[in-house]
């Protein structure tokens, strides 16, 4: 098995880890329902791009 020739320094390790981050989800205001929903997804009331796609989710 291959073994690293030198130990990875703290700076090198931390620079590599700077790319591991969480991005906030994009949320848009839906004018049809008056609610906020995520992009490219059907809203809880069953609308997508202002058109009715499915029945609204029931709260059972």
From Swiss-Prot:
Q: Name one GO molecular function term.
A: structural constituent of ribosome
What SUPFAM superfamilies does the database record attribute to this sequence? Zn-binding ribosomal proteins
Q: Name one GO cellular component term.
A: large ribosomal subunit
GO BP annotations, alphabetical order: translation
| Keywords recorded for this protein, A-Z | Ribonucleoprotein, Ribosomal protein
- The organism's superkingdom is given as Bacteria
What does the sequence similarity comment in the record state about its family? Belongs to the bacterial ribosomal protein bL32 family.
List the protein's name: Large ribosomal subunit protein bL32
Q: Which organism is it from?
A: Streptococcus pneumoniae serotype 4 (strain ATCC BAA-334 / TIGR4)
């Amino acid at each position: 098995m291959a073994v690293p020739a030198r130990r990875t320094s703290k700076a090198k390790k931390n620079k590599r880890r700077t790319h591991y981050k969480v991005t906030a989800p994009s949320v848009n205001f839906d004018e049809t329902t008056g609610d906020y929903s995520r992009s490219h997804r059907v809203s809880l009331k069953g609308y997508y791009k202002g058109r009715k796609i499915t029945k609204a989710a029931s709260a059972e």
